[in-house]
Amino acid sequence: MDPIDAEIIKILQDDGRASNAGIESKLMVSEGTVRRRLKKLVEDEFIQIIALPDPRKMGYESQALLGVQVEPDKIGDVANNLSNLGEVNWVAITTGTYDVFAWVTLPSAEALGLFLRNDVGSIPGVRKTETFVNLDKMRGHAITI
């Protein structure tokens, strides 16, 4: 990745629907150059082109961060099991009090409770969970290039 690639990414972070022609005019390179570089950035997994819906507008009122304590020999398995659940947005294996964190989105507090008891609670190796319910989203963005 070079400075032109980084600039393409910055433009797309500001406007995910920016056209190749629009990017071309900002960077003073050909549209073909933008198209090739963008294709390579996606193929090499530097970026993903995705739509990020607003969960609340989609009817999902409950978001939470789950801290999960896991039996030491089951950390990878628990993380994989969590990542396969549709309600889970992302999973991270971490250091500290919790071995795994997962961000989840569900339609309601009741659905969150059922998810914790029925889905997370049934994963072998889970010792303890603590749920941090999101009350208000203050800011969210991708890394700045």
Question: Model features per residue range: what roles?
Answer:
Residues 1-145:
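A compositional/biophysical signature of low hydrophobicity enriched in polar/charged and small residues
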